Amino acid sequence: MALRILFVEDHTHSRQTVSRLLRHFHYDVVAAPDYRTASALLDKWQFDVLLSDIRLPDGDGWNLVTVAKSKQPLVAIALTGLGTGKDEKPGLSCGFDHYFVKPLDFYRLRAILRGIVSRHSE
């Protein structure tokens, strides 16, 4: 089963690179550059995973995860440049299940995604 991932990242190069890597490992990736686009996609499609930057040009990932989880059950992963320990706690308390500080540790992300696939397969 291929996970459908909504990847929200405003930085074009990062969005393209991470999307390509995820597709290489056979994940179904839909990429959005901002909050508004991501919210519209959440209304249109069902996702297994939300992978979102925290700082977006028209909103923030903290609010997006709250909206996303009110619309559908999914695993939410924060990807952010906010790298202090004090930033992780609010991210997890607002609904993110995992918190990554940039640069992305792709091996750790793949391990988490494999775990999600395993749970979906049971």
Regions found by a protein language model. Give the residues of each.
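Acidic, metal-coordinating helix/loop segments flanking the phosphotransfer/catalytic sites
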Residues: 31-49, 89
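C-terminal output helix
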Residues: 104-114
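Acidic catalytic/metal-coordinating carboxylates
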Residues: 34, 60-63
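Short amphipathic alpha-helix used as the core "switch/output" element in two-component signaling
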Residues: 62-73
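Alpha4 helix (beta4-alpha4-beta5 surface) of REC/receiver domains from two-component response regulators
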Residues: 63, 83-99, 111
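Conserved acidic carboxylate
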Residues: 9
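Active-site residues of response regulator receiver
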Residues: 53, 80
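Two-component/phosphorelay signaling modules centered on CheY-like receiver
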Residues: 12-30
